[in-house]
C-alpha cells in the first residue's frame, strides 16, 4: 500500500508500528505482535529511513505491552467500558486485547491515517477521523460509561498547551475513567538536539517532530487539570523484560533502580478522573 501521501507528522505512526513488527521477529519478543509484522508487510515504504534503533524497538514494544495490561485490567473491572485510543496510528491493540462485545473501542487519528488504518487492519473498532487539536473529536464517543483513554507515542509530538487542552477535553466530556500514556520525563532542548544529531542520517526521525518538553514530577498534570488524580507511575526501565534489552539499555535498566532520573526516561503514567 502506498503511504507516500502521508505528511511527516502522520508518518510517525509508521515508526511505532515498524518497531512492534521488528520486536515480533525477535528470538525472544517482548510484545510479540505478529499483526504488526503483517501490517508492515503490506506497506510500500522504505522503513530503513526510520530511526528504529536496537534500543528504540524494545522500549516501544514494552510500553505497548504495559499499556495493554492496564487496558485489560480496566476492561476486567468494567465489561461495558469505552476504550479510546488517541493517535491510534496503525496500533493493533484492539486485536491484541480482543475486548468482549460489551466494550466499545474508538480509534482517533488524523483522517489520512484513519483511512490507511482501515485499509490495513481487520478491526471492529469505531474509527474517529479527526484532529485531537480540534474540539469536536469527542462528539461521537459515548460520555456516560466507564472510559479508558490511552495514548501510545503521541504526547511527545504535541506542545504542552495541546496536551493540557486534550486532557481537559477528556475530563470535560467523559463522566469517569482513567487516562494512560507513555512519557519520557523532562526533555530539554539539548536532549532534543542530541536526538536529532544522533539520527541525522535518517530522513524520517521522530526527533524532528518532537515538541513536548515533558516534566519530572508525575503529579504535574494535576496542576493543569483539577479533575485528574495520579493513579500510577510505572517505569518501563524497571520491568523484568528489561533483561531482554541490548547491552547499554540493559545497563540503564539496572541503574534505574538507583537513579530516579533514568527510571523517568521511559514510564507509563495513569490518572483517574
Which residues fall in each region the model found?
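Conserved catalytic loop of SAM-dependent methyltransferase domains
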Residues: 225-253
Amino acid at each position: 500500500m502506498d503511504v507516500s501521501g502521508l505528511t511527516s507528522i502522520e508518518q510517525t505512526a509508521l515508526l511505532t508500528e515498524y518497531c512492534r513488527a521488528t520486536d515480533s521477529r525477535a528470538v525472544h519478543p517482548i510484545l510479540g505482535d505478529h499483526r504488526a509484522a503483517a501490517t508492515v508487510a503490506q506497506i510500500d515504504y522504505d522503513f530503513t529511513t526510520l530511526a528504529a534503533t536496537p534500543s528504540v524497538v524494545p522500549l516501544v514494544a514494552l510500553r505497548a505491552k504495559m499499556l495493554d495490561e492496564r487496558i485489560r485490567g480496566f476492561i476486567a473491572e468494567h465489561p461495558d467500558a469505552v476504550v479510546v485510543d488517541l493517535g491510534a496510528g496503525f496500533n493493533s491493540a484492539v486485536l491484541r486485547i480482543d475486548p468482549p462485545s460489551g466494550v466499545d473501542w474508538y480509534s482517533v487519528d488524523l483522517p489520512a491515517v484513519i483511512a490507511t488504518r482501515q485499509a490495513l487492519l481487520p478491526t471492529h473498532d469505531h474509527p474517529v477521523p479527526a484532529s485531537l487539536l480540534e474540539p469536536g473529536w469527542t462528539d461521537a464517543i459515548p460520555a456516560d460509561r466507564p472510559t479508558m483513554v490511552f495514548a501510545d507515542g503521541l504526547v511527545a509530538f504535541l506542545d504542552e498547551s495541546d496536551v493540557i487542552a486534550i486532557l481537559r477535553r477528556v475530563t470535560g466530556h467523559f463522566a469517569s475513567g482513567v487516562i494512560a500514556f507513555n512519557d519520557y520525563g523532562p526533555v530539554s532542548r539539548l536532549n532534543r538536539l542530541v536526538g536529532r544529531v544522533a539520527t541525522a542520517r535518517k530522513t524520517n526521525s521522530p526527533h524532528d517532530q518532537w515538541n513536548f518538553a515533558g516534566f519530572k514530577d508525575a503529579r504535574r498534570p494535576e496542576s493543569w487539570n483539577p479533575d485528574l488524580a495520579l493513579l500510577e507511575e510505572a517505569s518501563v526501565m524497571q520491568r523484568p523484560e528489561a533483561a531482554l534489552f541490548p547491552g547499554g539499555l540493559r545497563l540503564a535498566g539496572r541503574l534505574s533502580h538507583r537513579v530516579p532520573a533514568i527510571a523517568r526516561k521511559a514510564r507509563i503514567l495513569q490518572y483517574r478522573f
